[in-house]
């Protein structure tokens, strides 16, 4: 049985349990900005690096490569306002890594408004299915945008795919229309929460139940799987801390009876 565990205590945690065993864990951080779409201002262009440094309202300017495949965008000038997306968050002395190749994530697809390429997830391996999804993507996009079909698209009805593409495209249109009058720098689109990202990734794979200590999660996850709200310490009930500690040990025991030794 696959259980999605959502703990909203002092240190939030989202876990995927397979038959009670912790298989994957996420630690949501307040202020996560990866995937956010921003309006920034070009502060400096470095021709030798074919890159620009962009003020996005953070402590450090973001780093923006200026030559990106399939976008067809020209070089900006110092002082220009540019729509960018955070690909990697700022870390240490480095500012955020930015892109102008915006991608908007849905359950079944990624929409790329700066590209016209139609792609399919590498996890879908059957040639016939890949070809059919590409044809469906082209019919939906009509050269207006690019699409990357996710694994959840494999068995989705065409009308549902078309509806999600239209929703994502309208989201992009809202961003594009807001940019000319927005303050620089500013946020044009907030990133998905960690919970939203996990739900998007695991919904097509199947979730048997959701267990949480936060009633608000039950509302967000309604219709995905049966939800159980337990107002007690889920980390204790499901022995999460001991499982995390065990997973970090040098010697890990495998279900087959063997051991895996991990040395740094």
Regions found by a protein language model. Give the residues of each.
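DE-rich acidic low-complexity regions and acidic surface loops
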Residues: 1-264
């Amino acid at each position: 049985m696959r259980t999605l565990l959502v703990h909203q205590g002092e240190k939030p945690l989202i876990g995927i349990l397979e038959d009670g065993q912790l298989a994957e864990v996420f630690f949501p951080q307040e202020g996560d900005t990866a995937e956010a779409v921003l309006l920034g201002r070009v502060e400096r262009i470095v021709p030798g690096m074919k890159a620009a440094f962009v003020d996005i309202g953070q402590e450090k300017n973001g780093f923006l490569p200026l030559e990106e495949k399939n976008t067809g965008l020209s070089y900006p000038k110092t002082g220009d306002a540019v729509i960018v997306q955070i690909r990697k968050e700022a870390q240490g002395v480095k500012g955020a890594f930015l892109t102008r190749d915006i991608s908007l994530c849905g359950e079944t697809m990624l929409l790329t408004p700066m590209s016209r390429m139609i792609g399919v997830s590498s996890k879908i391996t059957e040639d016939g299915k890949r070809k059919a999804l590409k044809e469906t993507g082209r019919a939906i996009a009509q050269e207006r945008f690019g699409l990357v079909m996710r694994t959840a698209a494999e068995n989705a009805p065409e009308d549902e795919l078309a509806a999600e593409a239209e929703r994502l495209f309208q989201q992009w249109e809202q961003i594009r229309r807001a940019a000319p009058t927005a303050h620089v720098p500013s946020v044009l689109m907030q990133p998905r929460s960690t919970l939203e990202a996990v739900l998007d990734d695991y919904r097509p794979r199947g979730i048997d139940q959701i267990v949480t200590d936060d009633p608000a999660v039950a509302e967000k996850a309604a219709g995905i799987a049966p939800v159980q709200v337990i107002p007690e310490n889920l980390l204790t009930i499901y022995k999460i801390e001991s499982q995390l500690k065990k997973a970090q040990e040098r010697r890990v025991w495998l279900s087959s009876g063997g051991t895996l030794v991990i040395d740094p």
